[in-house]
């Protein structure tokens, strides 16, 4: 397939002396990926202007339609710390995931000498899955597939630091099983950096 994943992985395995992966005959065939995603977020916040310490809660509902992914989702994020950014939370790796654009001029990325902030966050997202190309297989060609779970949830814990216009965040994401017969649930880390100017 056009992504050249096999060639890239074989190159690294040859370079490092690792055994080559043997599942490439079962990968998805070339197919354009199209996904339209809509998400609505609502924020409630409480911040002490003297200490800059505060907390907020951000709820969300959403919908994705496409051959790569079709699902409904809902969830929330809670943040607590100093100089919370005036944005809509920290997203892990996903389509349309970056939402850290400041929403006002008092965001710590803009405020004079106090251009720093530090906060912890916890979030969850639950999805009702209609289609997942990585589990259901290609849309128009016969390919391998597995029986997917209809409901999948993510929970995340993380920390974010803001200095000047930069924001560095780390999250550890815990995901429930995505298909029947899956040995265990997944956990992965997400490190992101953004800069506002």
Regions found by a protein language model. Give the residues of each.
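Outer-membrane beta-barrel pore domains and translocons
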Residues: 1, 62-66, 77-79, 123-129, ...
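Extracellular/periplasm-exposed beta-strand and loop segments of Gram-negative cell-envelope proteins
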Residues: 4-31, 64, 89, 133-137, ...
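Outer-membrane beta-barrel translocator/pore domains, especially the C-terminal barrels
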Residues: 8-12, 41, 47-49, 131-132
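Extended, solvent-exposed, turn-rich assembly/linker loops in the middle of proteins
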Residues: 19-48, 53-60
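Transmembrane beta-strand segments that form the barrel wall of outer-membrane beta-barrel proteins
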Residues: 23, 55-65, 144, 170-176
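Residues that define the transmembrane beta-barrel architecture of outer-membrane proteins
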Residues: 30-38, 55, 68-78, 114-116, ...
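Secondary-structure boundary elements
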Residues: 39-55, 68, 82-86, 161-166
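Outer membrane beta-barrel transmembrane domains
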Residues: 83-197
């Amino acid at each position: 397939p056009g992504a050249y994943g096999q060639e890239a992985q074989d190159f690294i395995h040859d370079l490092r002396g690792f055994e080559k992966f043997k599942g490439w005959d079962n990968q998805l065939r070339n197919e354009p990926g199209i996904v339209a995603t809509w998400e609505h977020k609502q924020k409630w916040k409480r911040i002490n202007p003297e200490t800059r310490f505060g907390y907020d809660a951000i709820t969300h509902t959403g919908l994705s339609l496409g051959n790569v992914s079709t699902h409904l989702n809902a969830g929330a994020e809670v943040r607590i710390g100093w100089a919370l950014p005036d944005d809509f939370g920290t997203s892990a790796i996903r389509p349309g995931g970056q939402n850290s654009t400041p929403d006002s001029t008092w965001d710590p990325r803009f405020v004079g000498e106090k251009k720093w902030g530090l906060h912890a966050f916890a979030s969850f997202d639950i999805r009702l899955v209609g289609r997942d190309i990585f589990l259901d297989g290609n849309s128009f060609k016969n390919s391998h597939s597995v029986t997917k779970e209809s409901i999948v949830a993510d929970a995340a814990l993380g920390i974010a630091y803001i200095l000047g216009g930069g924001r560095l965040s780390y999250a550890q994401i815990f995901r429930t099983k995505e298909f029947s017969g899956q040995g265990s649930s997944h956990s992965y880390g997400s490190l992101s950096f953004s800069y506002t100017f």
